[in-house]
């Protein structure tokens, strides 16, 4: 049975059991900072299990993409470990419980997958008599095929919170897969009894003291590994033989030219590359980019591990993007979004692999030096400081260092590495705090952590309010009052000031009372989701508890609102013009400009930029109303709202609809697109691998930019003595004229050099059986001096050329030696090193060619006069 068919049957089966079948969630968790990537079928559903959110149905079924890396070192070595897999699961949120979960699990296995009932075993938790009785009395599995196991095997819990016993369905693959022990049964470490389905009965809550209480809402969470089921149903020994993975393995075998099954180490490398290709494809496909931390580092680690094993197999060039092609061909039936993002995924992988190839050779060389020194010194452990140097200076992953060190029979001081890393992070943290000049979550600020600050600035730019706190952030003190000239942080409630977040910079303005006035220099959001005002008192004094009026700088905020709406419209236009793979990777919304970072693998062409500008300006001309919709997260997604994975969303969300551009956003926006007036992109740069940056202007700022460009064209036209509409034509004429003159200059230069070469050769000195050319010249730059020296040397069968020149009040030297004299011990680098000392300088180079400089050009002649002695000394000591 094909793997795609197994997946399809599973979802269809539970659809017949009134389950809401949902396509796989992204590998990137939404609003869950506790995990980097989704590693279990239930992980995206946690809010439904905890009751934080209401599920779309009390019954759900999914085939969830998962990534797990704790056992990454085992991937390729064992037949069952993988970083990427699909988890089939059916879930109940307070609906059905043990009986249905067990019956349906057995029904699907026997009737839909046609597994032999005689081969099925069940394991239950030691004390779970209810599950045992259902399996035996109602399903009909005999006592001898039901196993009671302890907490380690059959009780699911993670610290405190919901937990419960579980029951596993196992399949007996036969004695040939076993360990020959008479006690062999489910729970044994051998491969005979394959666990194919885990049914978790979440019925208890565990408190911090370890006490268990029964939950009011009992849930079901099941998981069946798709690839593991395929191994069973396709009757193959490992996941590398199933229909969706074997073609990838065959591709890697062909690419490497290695015969599978002849060398265990090479087989491991082949399997690592095969498995990691699947992981990389899906992780990049869901929007993760390689990085040095977070989920981006997980991706980088997997990709670089595969690349390194390619090198071990003798694959020299980048190779993974072709493997990505194959993974997509195989998996696009179930995941059509991979096809949509094919070129993007391939390019990101290619860029990262190429980057790794350039750095890994240098890192490997240094690591090998460390290992050689350890061997000479009789050491068994690589010091943490050395591993950190590889990581910090050369971008060499710790995991790769660990792997190579272990392969060579050594150990790694990981504690020392961690200490170095922590030291660096602490230094960076302190530097950041010093540069910011304040600690937002100070002890003084903590006094207000339970105080709610209401934001009213969507509708009001002026607000009657009250000061609830004054903080001297420099001394971490709470103040009762503040005087003219002092700078402090102030909390007011309610507040019309928007605190910097979501890329939108904070508001400025003023607050004033009967007793004083303060300029609001900036607004930020602290760790308690409160707007904090950085203010300077300009008149009188302000006291805690004062009634104040808050007034936002109107024009500045209006400009910010226009630019924020423009970022949404730009995001939409990028997806339309460049491709659906484009995702926002960062933004800055300021009053005078906007900046937008997005995922893409190449610079945008001029034509693409024009098309993007046309799309945005078209939306502006339509003058569509900007709609704000407050709704729940699920409905927002049904509206097609774009959610940024890095952002956290509550169940209640705010949707901004600007024509076809629909996004979740908490920022402030224009009321209609026509307010933007004009949109103009003025800069494009690269932020990093796979991330581009556009900077743009709107409204008055865009007009000023175009006016400036027009003035520049006018100035150029005046310089060229032509009309503005003929600037390009006239410039082209000048360029062609310059090219012609450059050719003429080059021709004259060659003629001069020919005469100069002949002149220098005529002044050469015969020493034994070779010629010495040592001369002082004037006003030759380094390039010309090298060129002339090369021409002279090429005229000599055997000889030494040393030329010196005075230029820009400095001395320059170039030395060249023919091959025969190099073999006799003449060394150009040592010659220029000595002559340069005479002029107060230094330098060096190769035996056949070297260059040096000095600060005292008046001693050039003295230096050149010493060349003959140096050459003779070198020959006499050879």
From Swiss-Prot:
Molecular function GO terms recorded: alanine-tRNA ligase activity; aminoacyl-tRNA deacylase activity; ATP binding; catalytic activity, acting on a protein; transferase activity; tRNA binding; zinc ion binding
Taxonomic lineage: Bacteria, Bacillati, Bacillota, Clostridia, Natranaerobiales
Cofactor binding note of this UniProt entry: Binds 1 zinc ion per subunit.
UniProt keyword list: Aminoacyl-tRNA synthetase, ATP-binding, Cytoplasm, Ligase, Metal-binding, Nucleotide-binding, Protein biosynthesis, RNA-binding, tRNA-binding, Zinc
EC number assigned by the record: 6.1.1.7
Stretches of the chain forming a coiled coil according to its record: none
Pfam families tied to this protein: DHHA1, tRNA-synt_2c, tRNA_SAD
Summary of the function given for this chain in its UniProt record: Catalyzes the attachment of alanine to tRNA(Ala) in a two-step reaction: alanine is first activated by ATP to form Ala-AMP and then transferred to the acceptor end of tRNA(Ala). Also edits incorrectly charged Ser-tRNA(Ala) and Gly-tRNA(Ala) via its editing domain.
Reaction(s) catalysed by this chain's protein: tRNA(Ala) + L-alanine + ATP = L-alanyl-tRNA(Ala) + AMP + diphosphate
UniProt-annotated location(s): Cytoplasm
NCBIfam families per UniProt: alaS
InterPro entries registered for this protein in UniProt: aa-tRNA-synth_II/BPL/LPL, Ala-tRNA-lgiase_IIc, Ala-tRNA-ligase_IIc_anticod-bd, Ala-tRNA-synth_IIc_core, Ala-tRNA-synth_IIc_N, Ala-tRNA_ligase, Ala_tRNA_ligase_euk/bac, DHHA1_dom
Domain of life: Bacteria
Residues annotated to bind Zn(2+): 564, 568, 665, 669
GO biological process, one term: alanyl-tRNA aminoacylation
Similarity-based family: Belongs to the class-II aminoacyl-tRNA synthetase family.
EC main group: ligase
Notes on the domains: Consists of three domains; the N-terminal catalytic domain, the editing domain and the C-terminal C-Ala domain. The editing domain removes incorrectly charged amino acids, while the C-Ala domain, along with tRNA(Ala), serves as a bridge to cooperatively bring together the editing and aminoacylation centers thus stimulating deacylation of misacylated tRNAs.
First-listed, main subcellular location of the protein, grouped into a coarse class: cytoplasm
Transmembrane segments: none
Cofactor requirements of the protein: Zn(2+)
Protein name: Alanine--tRNA ligase
GO CC annotation terms, alphabetical: cytosol
